[in-house]
């Protein structure tokens, strides 16, 4: 297994590593290595929705490195950088040199792109004594772990009052 090229990101950034065999398997024999992600909510393998991959080697391609691409998944949570593992399974083969061989797992981190905070859009329109309104939107930068309440008030109620609605 070659060294991983870096980390994945919640913005869809990828990391890669490669796998090849040290020796050729017996003629007409294949060696299969199954890969899966320990946390498909943080990273996927080769963009697979099924989140698993089987690499197959034979007497012709055993020394050719097969590249595995990992893609970060955005969870919309401010949960810091999250480590996950690409789990390799025991090889499937009839070749005695590879029976029961379990390649090393690959550790990777999905870099978080979410942050805590509140976003307020620029005000649209102006209020007037004739009753015209102005609007602005308030939203969270990322999904909260618990309910969040934001109090909004007017500094001078004689000049304007606050009313609004909640949208999800």
Give the label of every model feature segment.
Residues 1-168:
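Short boundary segments that mark the start of a structured unit
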């Amino acid at each position: 297994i070659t060294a991983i090229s870096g980390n994945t990101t919640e913005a869809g950034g990828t990391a890669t590593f490669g796998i090849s065999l040290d020796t050729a398997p017996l003629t007409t024999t294949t060696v299969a290595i199954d890969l899966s992600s320990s946390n498909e909510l943080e990273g996927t393998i080769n963009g697979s929705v099924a989140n698993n991959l089987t690499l197959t080697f034979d007497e012709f391609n055993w020394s050719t490195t097969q590249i595995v691409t990992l893609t970060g998944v955005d969870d919309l949570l401010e949960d810091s950088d999250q480590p996950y593992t690409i789990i390799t399974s025991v090889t499937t083969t009839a070749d005695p040199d590879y029976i029961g061989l379990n390649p090393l797992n690959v550790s990777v981190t999905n870099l978080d792109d979410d942050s805590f905070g509140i976003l307020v859009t620029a005000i649209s329109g102006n209020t007037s004594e004739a009753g015209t309104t102005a609007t602005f939107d308030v939203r969270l930068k990322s999904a909260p772990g618990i309910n969040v309440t934001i109090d909004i008030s007017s500094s001078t109620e004689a000049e304007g009052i606050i009313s609004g609605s909640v949208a999800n």
